[in-house]
Amino acid sequence: MIKYIDKVKASTLAGTALLRLDFNTTDNWRMQAVLPTIKYLLKASGKIIIISHRGRPDGFDKKLSLKKDAVVLSGMVGKKVVFIDNFDFSKIKSQVAAAPKGSIFLLDNLRFLKGEEINDPELGKQLASLADMYVNDAF
């Protein structure tokens, strides 16, 4: 059942949110469009891990990294967005667990992972293990 986050009790949103966004553009209009979701989750949940993709790379491609997006998004939300440039899920879990409430993380381009485009269930499980809830605001 699909639920809208503004229709869910705030206590249900406590914890870490895995937020799927779509940054697959050359400008920032999609970032602007998702600011209300990010701000709502910051109030309601403890931490946010943002996941997204860009392009169709065959492995790592520096030009398609989301590193610059973390800087731009930091300016938009008025707080640091921690960029995570690796996909070592145990390290990511530790980093998020050690961070204070209100922290925002941005994982690098999910398309750098072979399993992203083929909807690998194991990758889905690894991503899901990072958070308490999943919020999709990719459009």
Where are the language model's segments positioned?
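Active-site loop-to-helix "anion-binding N-cap" substructures in soluble metabolic enzymes
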Residues: 1-139
